[in-house]
């Protein structure tokens, strides 16, 4: 088993409650079976493009975390063989900082 962790230091989003700008640090951990990840794995650019797309419209931190986990859990045979995915989001909403963690 192999775990690969990607950390995105700052992703901007729009708050669905007040329309303000939210800032997130996002950590995505993929656990792959055996050495399968060497031939087929999620690229940082793919993740970054997805984050940019889903944060164009207002989204809550919880919904952001869930969408990332579901999108990259590897259910399709053409996708990387992800055994487990953990998504951690650390949000800054004005003066408030929050952490959300989801594992599938």
For each feature predicted by the language model, list its residue ranges.
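N-terminal intrinsically disordered, cationic/polar leader segments
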Residues: 1-104
């Amino acid at each position: 088993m192999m775990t690969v962790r990607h950390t995105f230091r700052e992703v901007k989003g729009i708050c669905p409650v007040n329309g303000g700008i939210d800032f997130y640090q996002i950590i995505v951990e993929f656990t792959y079976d055996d050495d399968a990840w060497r031939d087929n794995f999620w690229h940082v650019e793919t993740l970054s493009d997805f984050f940019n797309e889903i944060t164009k419209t207002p989204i809550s931190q919880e919904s952001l975390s869930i969408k990332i986990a579901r999108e990259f859990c590897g259910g399709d045979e053409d996708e990387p063989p992800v055994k487990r995915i953990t998504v951690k989001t650390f949000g800054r909403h004005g003066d408030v900082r929050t952490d959300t963690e989801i594992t599938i």
